Design a protein with these regions (language model features):
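Positively charged, amphipathic and often flexible ligand-engagement surfaces
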Residues: 27-345
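Low-complexity, intrinsically disordered or signal/transmembrane-proximal segments
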Residues: 2-4
Length: 345
């Protein structure tokens, strides 16, 4: 098992136990499902606080806590972590953290970092692709600029040998339709097929219809649960409903014949996927499980040892606060690790 925090490979039982977020002291019991929805709403609200973000991102404690979930702030940091993950049998999707840039200069700087990433991935022969947000590429500033910038990255990925891949992340519901339209548009460009993909959130009520349209064109999908604050008329509010829809959509993806990513740390859902794959004679290399950097590393390695494909979503950069809050919203059990890091200050 590799230690994603400092690129060490822990060998002691203590290190291994520390990596397993399921190993909690009795005084920190697993959060009951009836309280998970409340905590989820709380962390989503906190993710939108500009004041808390400014305080957290400039505090020593905040930076220490974020190191569990974020590879570092520099390009060299993410490249070292990616190489370590590859050596542990994991593929990677790299995300340069950021969203909702406010000017064209920020947007151009963001896309330039992604061009450098693609160059370094190729030069170092890393098994990694890139994930990005359209608002980080300037969608709020100039939609045409954002489209041109991402189109350039997809064209570059498609021209590489071996070909690489660009995942366009999903953001809040205000961006859902524009994001999907853009992915469809990029996919239809000659030579881009298989080099650009979308993200579908199972808590969105519209997701089944979106999945059907994406599958009709053979567009690769990452399926996740969703971690933005949305009203009941747009998104499912109960965890049980979100999980049930995830499983329903997951089976559609697995039977489609295209290569998709199942992004979850939920062992019940993972076991359901494994059982379904066996029952339907779906090969283990026909899809991949996707997990977040710093979360359930024991499970990542267990799946790899069983012969399943696992991709780790590894972010880097200084704008980590919204990302961390959304990870706590998705999995309130991660709060134990945050508390432990603060106490170890």
């Amino acid at each position: 098992m590799y230690d994603q925090k400092r690129l060490r490979f822990p060998s002691s039982p203590c290190d291994t136990k520390f990596c397993d977020l399921s190993a909690r002291p009795k005084r920190f019991p697993i959060v009951p499902s009836e309280r998970s929805d409340v905590l989820r709403a709380l962390f989503i609200t906190l993710s939108e606080s500009r004041w808390l973000r400014a305080v957290a991102e400039h505090s020593a404690v905040g930076q220490k806590v974020s190191s569990r979930f974020v590879a570092g702030t520099q390009l060299d940091d993410i490249l070292r972590v990616t190489q370590a993950a590859n050596q542990a049998g994991l593929t990677v999707s790299v995300d340069n953290l950021g969203e909702n840039v406010t000017n064209a200069e920020e947007a151009r700087a963001s896309v330039e970092r992604y061009h450098l990433l693609l160059d370094e991935i190729a030069a170092r022969k890393l098994n990694a692709n890139i994930s990005l947000k359209l608002t980080h590429m300037g969608l709020d500033v100039d939609a045409k600029l954002a489209r041109e910038q991402v189109a350039g990255l997809v064209a570059k990925a498609a021209s590489m040998s071996p070909r690489n891949f660009v995942r366009v992340d999903m953001e809040g519901s205000a961006y859902t339709q524009r994001t999907l339209d853009f992915v469809h548009e990029l996919h239809r460009v000659s030579g881009n097929q298989g080099c650009v993909g979308a993200v579908i959130q199972s808590y969105m009520r519209r997701s089944e219809n979106d999945v059907e349209k994406l599958l009709a064109e053979g567009i690769r999908i990452r399926l996740c649960k969703g971690a933005y604050k949305e009203p009941p008329e747009i998104a499912l509010q109960k965890k049980s409903e979100v999980d049930a829809n995830y499983i329903k959509l997951m089976k559609l993806l697995m039977k489609s014949g295209a290569y998709h990513g199942l992004a979850t740390h939920d062992e019940r859902i993972i076991n359901e996927a494994k059982t379904f794959a066996t029952r339907e004679a779906i090969p283990r290399d026909a899809f991949e499980f996707q997990m977040l950097y710093g979360i359930r590393r024991d499970l990542q390695q267990s799946l790899v040892h069983e012969g399943w494909r696992v991709r780790v979503y590894i972010p880097f950069g200084t704008e980590w606060y919204p990302y961390l809050m959304r990870r706590l919203a998705e999995r309130p059990a991660n709060l134990w690790f945050v508390a432990k890091n603060i106490m170890r200050r």
